[in-house]
Amino acid sequence: MEISNKTIEELKKAGWYEGRKIDISKNVKFLEERGFEVFESAKKFMEEFGELQINVEKIWSDGSKAISEHTTCIKEVIGMLDSSFFSLEDFIDDKVIPVGALYDLEIDLYISESERLFKSTGWVGDNALEALDNIILEKGTVIWDKFEG
């Protein structure tokens, strides 16, 4: 899948670069202490895309501007909550873990054990870059009652 230049630009502004691999040991410990199983796809995502603040400016047809704030800063996403507050098991047959929050912390972002990403409202991408491209470009989400897989 080809990723848009806008998505690459927004990710780079947030501190991402190709081959990025940050130390996630404190975040893994933080998550495990709260009852989360931190599987390999989540670790891989956090190493490359963790601890980013992605602020995307949108210009409306009337010329006004709005900023969509997205974060992959795990402690900001989880806060004082534990794993019992984050689940998609009613919607998919795959383990998930929260790895971000979208639209000013209004919607959680999850990664599954199979590397697919989901918003709390539905599927958003089959891999991290596809999901981030869909989020940054505000492409549609496949809502739960239509999701298969």
Provide a role label for each language-model segment:
Residues 1-105, 149:
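A surface-exposed partner-binding patch
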Residues 105-110, 122-132:
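Short, surface-exposed beta-strand/loop "edge" segments at domain boundaries and coil↔beta transitions
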Residues 111-115:
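Short acidic-glycine loop/turn motifs at beta-strand connectors
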Residues 117-120:
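Short hydrophobic/aromatic-rich beta-strand segments that constitute the beta-sheet cores
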Residues 125-149:
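Compact, glycine/acidic-enriched structural inserts
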